[in-house]
Design a protein with these regions (language model features):
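Long, low-complexity intrinsically disordered regulatory regions enriched in P/S/T/G and acidic residues
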Residues: 1-12, 64-90
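The feature marks the first
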Residues: 2-52
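Short, solvent-exposed interaction modules
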Residues: 33, 73-122
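Acidic (E/D-rich), amphipathic helical modules within compact regulatory domains
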Residues: 38-82
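A structural feature that tracks compact, well-ordered secondary-structure segments
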Residues: 40-47, 55-58, 110-130
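Glycine-rich, aromatic-bearing surface loops/beta-hairpins
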Residues: 126-157
Length: 157
């Protein structure tokens, strides 16, 4: 996979809704966090498939994220831009990941594995574990083992 394609992919664990994009893919959620916009699920559902694909394929460079924030300022509420979030850090495995893995009887990624994940993969794992997040329900916690397997399958231990 080319580095430029990493920002717009849909993970295998998201396959249940990837055909019609009925839920926001992690790639879109990450870009929204990076540009400081909150898109409600109801608004996402009102978008056409082409509009959803446009957001999915939108670049994640600083310039592209600025353009995305401008484009969405009328339809999305503003939130703090993601800066120095745990998924942007590679110096330690976040405690939330450790807790969620232990609770779901999954092996905890070691530091080397965490460092080998790209930013979108780290973002997805943390969103799947985050309390109070729409992905932290039991069904999404069920996606945690799938995501871990998908992301860590070819990583050096």
């Amino acid at each position: 996979m080319k580095k430029t394609e990493r920002h717009c992919r849909i993970f295998k664990f998201e396959a249940e809704f990837s055909d019609n994009l009925r839920c926001l893919p992690m790639a879109v959620r990450r870009k929204l966090d990076l540009c400081g916009r909150k898109l409600r699920l109801q608004h996402w559902l009102e978008l056409g498939y082409e509009q959803k694909m446009e957001l999915l394929n939108w670049g994640d460079s600083e310039l592209e994220l600025h353009k995305l924030a401008d484009r969405l300022k009328e339809s999305c509420s503003e939130i703090n831009r993601a800066i120095q979030e745990e998924w942007q850090q590679i110096d330690r495995v976040p405690g939330l990941i450790e807790e969620a893995c232990l609770a779901s009887k999954q092996p905890v990624p070691n530091l080397r594995q965490w460092q080998q994940l790209d930013e979108l993969e780290r973002f997805a794992l943390l969103k799947l574990c985050s309390p109070g997040h729409s992905h932290s329900n039991s069904k999404s916690r069920g996606n945690l083992p799938l995501a871990l397997r998908e992301f860590l399958e070819n990583k050096i231990t």
